[in-house]
Regions:
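N-terminal beta-alpha lobe that positions the nucleotide/phosphoryl donor
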Residues: 1-179, 188
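Short intrinsically disordered coil segments
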Residues: 130, 194-197
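Contiguous beta-strand/loop segments that form the cofactor/metal-binding neighborhood of enzyme cores
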Residues: 180, 193
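Phosphate/diphosphate-binding loops
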Residues: 186-192
Length: 200
């Protein structure tokens, strides 16, 4: 780890900075596209896979072992518990934490913030991972670090193991980035579907 990078990947990327999906995850990659089109996207930045890889460095072996597990049994639960404990309680690399806190301060604006998972595999061609990961909404700036920990920890939940089993996935565990974004103030909000999400 050197400066504000991990294996060449910057810890933080801002909305106006182009970055590959492997660095920022599916959600942030789509937000980049909307931002480039000039859409009115609330300001955001992403804690990249470089940052989360650095955080997860002490449990890299457990993550590789969990990726080989097919069932949610005592073995996979043990791996997941050690990973989650590391995320929730360990001291992060100082440069990662400093980069996050500095970016939260720069985001400013006084609006509540959203903390949203952005997996590299999320919303991809081979799978959506819809509903597998976590978001935390309406947060003050001083709650962001704890929310990042919870969103990252949720990436190793039983439902993710089950989703991978159902899809026959045996490869590397999904890599997570985390989006931190200003929340929009609206009078009316909704979601439009181009197809029935239950039947396609």
């Amino acid at each position: 780890m050197t400066g504000l990078r991990w294996r060449g990947v910057a810890f933080v990327r801002w909305s106006e900075e182009a970055a590959p999906r492997t660095h920022v995850g599916g959600k942030a990659f789509q937000l980049q596209a909307l931002t480039r089109l000039g859409m009115p996207v609330p300001r955001w930045f992403v804690l990249t896979t470089g940052a989360t890889d650095a955080i997860l460095g002490p449990v890299r072996g457990e993550i590789a072992a969990l990726a080989r597990c097919v069932e949610w049994d005592s073995e996979s639960r043990g791996y997941a518990a050690r990973i989650v404990a590391c995320i929730r309680t360990s001291r992060w690399p100082a440069a990662v934490r400093a980069a996050l806190l500095r970016a939260v301060e720069q985001l400013g604006g006084g609006r509540p913030l959203a903390v949203r998972s952005s997996a590299v595999e999320e919303d991809g061609r081979s799978g959506s991972y819809a509903g597998m990961f976590e978001s935390r909404l309406g947060l003050p700036p001083d709650a962001v670090e704890a929310a990042v920990r919870e969103c990252l920890a949720a990436g190793f939940a039983e439902r993710v193991v089950a989703y991978r089993r159902e899809r026959g996935e045996r490869g590397a565990w999904p890599r997570l980035a985390i989006v931190i974004q200003e929340m929009a103030t609206t009078r009316v909000a909704g979601v439009a579907f181009s197809a029935d999400p239950r039947t396609g």
